[in-house]
Amino acid sequence: MESMFSSPAEAALQREAGMPGLLTPLPDLDRVYELERVAGFVRDLGCERVALQFPDQLLGDAVAVAARLEETTGSKMFILGDTAYGSCCVDVLGAEQAGAQAVIHFGPACLSPPARPLPVTFVLCRRSVALELCVKAFEAQNPDPKAPVVLLSEPACAHALEALATLLRPRYLDLLVSSPAFPLPVGSLSPEPKPLERFGRRFPLAPGRRLEEYGAFYVGGSKASPDPDLDPDLSRLLLGWAPGQPFSSCCPDTGKTQDEGARAGRLRARRRYLVERARDARVVGLLVGTLGVAQHREALAHLRNLTQAAGKRSYVLALGRPTPAKLANFPEVDVFVLLACPLGALAPQLSGSFFQPILAPCELEAACNPAWPPPGLAPHLTHYADLLPGSPFHVPLPPSESELWETPDVSLITGDLRPPPAWKSSNDHGSLALTPRPQLELAESSPAASFLSSRSWQGLEPRLGQTPVTEAVSGRRGIAIAYEDEGSG
């Protein structure tokens, strides 16, 4: 299940060495990778060094695309083909190390704004869509021509939504077309009126309309995962969509449709269980999963305030890629919260190889903030920026004297009554002075020290003062297969 965060470690060992072959025929490169638009982007900026970020599955075309762009723009192209948490986020750090003045991101993207103001453009690598088959599938799933429906798609199929809507509008009166929410260029003005942005998409809602009034028709399907429940783009849509509205998906190649109601129910049940685990937890580990997405520092501070307000202890862990072996070194942590981009925030299933569950920031918000979710909002947002002040979905913590904190709460897992959180001042460092001793020593009680003393193994024993002091002597010389003090036989 760790593959949810990045490519499995075994993939590097199983991959055959050598230059990968060309995946896209040369005549189709311009169309698939939108090279004319990309070349115009580079020329308009006047960049001399540009970073081209490719996912693993598209590296076979990287050399041909870079050569074509160098020929048409005269700029130097650098290929970025390795990222720590998959390739959906813009690798700003890698681009800066190459001295690039702009980044061109190819392939699936979470469309999260980068943490640093570097010019970025996205190429979603268009996937062919059988429009006639999709029209028949839409008509079969939506017999009522007056029902409000939103057209959604995976990023690679977004180019075909307007054409699909053109074929459907003569019959369907209330049709809304979504579009990818590309980050606005630095210094540009927001359009007026500003469309609603949710799930990495923009929705041009009419005045007085709400997204919760619409059903959904999704065109696309993940080719990377054999389990559709682990498709992060579709999963975040199913989790955040209004539970009472229909949601169906359609394969862009065959037109095969599926009602996603049952899958959405399974996903919501799984996430509600994780929220209950977070409410029962006393120690929370905050995993820093991204440094290249905007507002990650503010989100980390927000999560720490949440845990403190709920009477929980939190630890910030920067471990690189989360793996079961790394997280097993922290048995005192009850749950982990992964601070990552919207696609990486969906944690793997609890039945996987991780010893403790891994949550999304929204699930910690639901567990620690008694005022969450706001009325009329589906209780799951995958982007941590939606939880911060300034977002229309931000819900401030109730004051300490609010009755919301005193509401009786029973754990649905253990059946025990949860005590209300004990409020502490911000100057409290987690230890409580008990009694001053006559020798002017101070006895303290620390939860961390109490847990350490109860562990059967507490680490390497220093044994200070119990081992004799010896003089330094010469060690072995040579290499492991032939030390000088060993025979040559």
Swiss-Prot record:
Modification Phosphoserine occurs at: S7, S446, S456, S488
GO molecular function: 2-(3-amino-3-carboxypropyl)histidine synthase activity; 4 iron, 4 sulfur cluster binding; metal ion binding
GO biological process terms, semicolon-separated: protein histidyl modification to diphthamide
Chain sites annotated for binding [4Fe-4S] cluster: C89, C110, C341
Needed cofactors: [4Fe-4S] cluster
Keywords associated with the record: Acetylation, Iron, Iron-sulfur, Metal-binding, Phosphoprotein
N-acetylmethionine modifications at: M1
Keyword Metal-binding: yes
Residues that bear Phosphothreonine: T435, T467
InterPro entries assigned: DHP2, DPH1/DPH2, DPH1/DPH2_1, DPH1/DPH2_3
Pathway field: Protein modification; peptidyl-diphthamide biosynthesis
Gene3D superfamilies with a match to the protein in the record: Diphthamide synthesis DPH1/DPH2 domain 1, Diphthamide synthesis DPH1/DPH2 domain 3
The organism's place on the tree of life at top rank: Eukaryota
Comment on bound cofactor: Binds 1 [4Fe-4S] cluster per subunit. The cluster facilitates the reduction of the catalytic iron-sulfur cluster in the DPH1 subunit.
Pfam families assigned: Diphthamide_syn
Family, per entry: Belongs to the DPH1/DPH2 family. DPH2 subfamily.
Subunit structure: Component of the 2-(3-amino-3-carboxypropyl)histidine synthase complex composed of DPH1, DPH2, DPH3 and a NADH-dependent reductase. Interacts with DPH1.
Protein known as: 2-(3-amino-3-carboxypropyl)histidine synthase subunit 2
UniProt gene name: DPH2
